[in-house]
Amino acid sequence: AGGNGGWLWGNGGNGGSGAPGQAGGAGGAAGLIGNGGAGGAGGQGLPFEAGANGGAGGAGGWLFGNGGAGGNGGIGGAGTNLAIGGHGGNGGNAGLIGAGGTGGAGGTGGGEPSAGASGGNGGNGGNGGLLIGNSGDGGAAGNGAGISQNGPASGFGGNGGHAGTTGLIGNGGNGGAGGAGGDVSADFGGVGFGGQGGNGGAGGLLYGNGGAGGNGGAAGSPGSVTAFGGNGGSGGSGGNGGNALIGNAGAGGSAGAGGNGASAGTAGGSGGDGGKGGNGGSVGLIGNGGNGGNGGNGGAGSLFNGAPGFGGPGGSGGASLLGPPGLAGTNGADG
């Protein structure tokens, strides 16, 4: 772990990166004035083991300073579909004045040729200063691993991290994007679904804009197969936009598209459904309501009776007391 900064002044040290199978070190905290250290990256997973998690970012100074960024999660190891990607570390919190740290990204899933592991989740953003400061963005999620041989399924995409909270004055951070589901390039095997986008942070209690929700991850698709037409996976939902009191609310994230069904000699695969768009944030007093995110498109059905996937619904627009409401997101098209 990184060392702490001086009691009066000084930045916290950065955490070290983890060796294979070991978590990243946490960032050191600052004292009265200074920035928190960044968390170290998690190591790649050993064979048959998950990727290690990223270290958390250190806290910013009690009076002034930004929180450190969270470390990224490690890639999952080989040999099993339980070898998920490591989760990203959370961003450090600010003290009285300062911005929260960004959450670390999730690691890509590991696995084996016939069974893919899911991606790791993104870390949550750190909280902004109690008085003034923006909250940190959520980290992006890791993608699920694909498979190249016949087996159970490919990996699911991880979920994006949520933005941190703000204090009195500040803008909410954006939610992290969901990871994509793994593809299948074999005769049969289930495909991974897309992960959900993280929620945007709310604006400050007195003033500030809400953050946007993260986009949902796209679903995996089966490849060109001959024995059995695999179904496309469902797209991930978009995150919700952050609310605001005085300021503009955040927009909802767009959803991921459903995967296409694969063609086959006897029975074609069905397309996956698109995810739901995130809802726009609402405004309590003055400002624009957030627009809803768009729904994901449905995947196409294959030849030989493969059914198309349904498009996902768009998110609703946010309301505003003394301002225009947000627009609803468009519905995704059917496959």
What do these predicted regions represent?
Residues A1-G335:
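Long, compositionally biased tandem-repeat segments
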